[in-house]
């Protein structure tokens, strides 16, 4: 069974909390470079992130952001699958969102108790603007390969050990009860920032159903985004 965009988006976001630093133990080859690349992504003032399902070639998610002079994060997020389109947009002062299966957008007003939690900045970043979106677990790598490319970029490939992942990560993964296989490729640009991340594998959900994961995240226009058109359509009337 192929994963839907909704599950994959949730999986990537949930994987963000599973970073293991390696503590005082030795870390796999390339780990420090990947860790630094993630940290540099965390410091970007703007950029774009695209998620693609490599099995179908479909674009599952598009996210773009920039930080304005007021330290407000302006961003647009759109994710789609067979159940519809999910979206979020912030102009820095207002937050809009659209649920899958719904035609109209909604706005979180200043009267809403969650209003402040939906205003983002350079330090309080939207999840897809955080380096932790690129999964990295230094304690569960079974095999590692690092390739230095002619243009100064670096490719780090990890084959994760499912048994170690099941021991170290499953308890923290929403909707995943077991890993069968997982591999990851980290493409690091010559400036040290992460340029792309590919993740393939097979996992079981909470009901025991087995599903494949085959996604690619690509970063473009790092510190080169200065304007983001609003995707917000018709708003639902507030009663």
Q: Positions of the model-derived regions?
A:
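Sec-dependent N-terminal signal peptides of Gram-positive bacterial secreted proteins and lipoproteins
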Residues: 3-26
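N-terminal leader/targeting segments and the immediate start of mature chains
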Residues: 18-70, 224-239
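Short, solvent-exposed coil/turn segments at beta-strand boundaries
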Residues: 41-47, 64-75, 88-96, 151, ...
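Beta-turn initiation residues at beta-strand->coil junctions
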Residues: 51-56, 76-81, 97-101, 198-204
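A structural detector for short beta-strand units
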Residues: 59-63, 83-87, 182-184, 213-217
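An acidic-aromatic
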Residues: 64-127
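Flexible, processing/modification-adjacent segments and terminal tails
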Residues: 102-168, 176
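Gly/Pro-enriched, hydrophobic low-complexity segments
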Residues: 152-233
């Amino acid at each position: 069974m192929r994963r839907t965009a909704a599950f994959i988006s949730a999986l990537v976001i949930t994987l963000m909390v599973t970073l293991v630093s390696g503590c005082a133990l030795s870390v796999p080859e390339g780990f420090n470079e990947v860790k630094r690349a993630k940290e540099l992504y965390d410091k970007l003032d703007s950029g774009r992130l695209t998620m693609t399902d490599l099995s179908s070639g479909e674009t599952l998610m598009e996210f773009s952001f920039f930080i304005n002079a007021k330290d407000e994060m302006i961003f647009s997020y759109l994710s789609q699958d067979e159940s519809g389109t999910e979206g979020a947009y912030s102009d820095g002062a207002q937050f809009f969102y659209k649920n899958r299966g719904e035609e109209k957008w909604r706005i979180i007003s200043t009267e809403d108790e969650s209003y402040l939690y939906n205003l983002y900045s350079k330090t309080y970043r939207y999840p897809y603007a955080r380096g932790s979106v690129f999964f990295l677990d230094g304690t569960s790598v079974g095999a590692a390969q690092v390739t230095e490319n002619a243009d100064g970029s670096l490719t780090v490939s990890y084959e994760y050990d499912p048994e170690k992942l099941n021991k170290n990560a499953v308890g923290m993964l929403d909707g995943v009860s077991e890993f069968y296989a997982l591999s990851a490729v980290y493409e690091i640009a010559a400036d040290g920032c992460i340029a792309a991340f590919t993740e393939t594998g097979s996992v079981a959900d909470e009901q025991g159903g087995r599903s494949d994961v085959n996604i690619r995240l690509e970063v473009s226009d790092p510190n080169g985004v200065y304007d983001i058109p609003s995707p917000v359509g018709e708003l639902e009337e507030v009663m």
